């Protein structure tokens, strides 16, 4: 897809020749670090932007190797769609299971399993169907709302942008067409108003000495001037006066818009506070259960130890009481304790 919309092809062709390839290694479009290009693997998260006449895209190319799993979590944390690459010759591996599980854990609403390198299995429908059955069985134990399978060959471009003439048995859309038609607007929660305050705006000028605005990104729900809101954790209630952006005032704001909200009353609000509806407020708790993806290889998560915990823009200290169970990523079975 980037091949069709990137101006970096000449550089990629040159590096491919330097590495002795007889073909253009398109993975170099997203492998930006020198170490990545030298080793032929993805290490860091590479963000690339492109657009078609129908939609704008941001690709977060994340590493597949186990030692760089934390970078994969970073890239997937804000994604609307997860593309899980599966080698047609190998089927589901520990790596692909790990990626599918993490995408599910992070709540990515759409998952597309791209069965790649179909050219190396003679475009076999039976190979594709076998992998689809294996992945579908695994996905039944995940929280995946929308699961799609596409057979393709990234090297030759089959089913990437154009339909493949080598796989007439596949009646689905090619990858780019599927992404263009994917409906993501309904994935946003427009009911439960949650506006975490990121920054308090207090201009230091005589003309605006009484101005106080609260900047942040709308996490969920819809905000409008005149709406009643409650400030947590303090519990004060007030009314939204205006909603502002750099382009002017708004009549409403919804996810993932970044805005400045002003209130009719002067209330002590700081970074980390949250605006919500009085009748639909989140619970304020001292104790919670959480599913954690632990990344620190040098130290284990230890019950009784104090850690920093970050929720939107608020940071606090927390003590781990106990570990109820661990999850085997390959089988998804729970290991107690």
Residue ranges and their predicted role:
Residues 18-24, 31-43, 138-147, 180-193, ...:
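Active-site phosphate-binding and catalytic loops of NTP-dependent enzymes
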Residues 52-55, 203-337:
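C-terminal effector/interaction modules appended to NTPase cores
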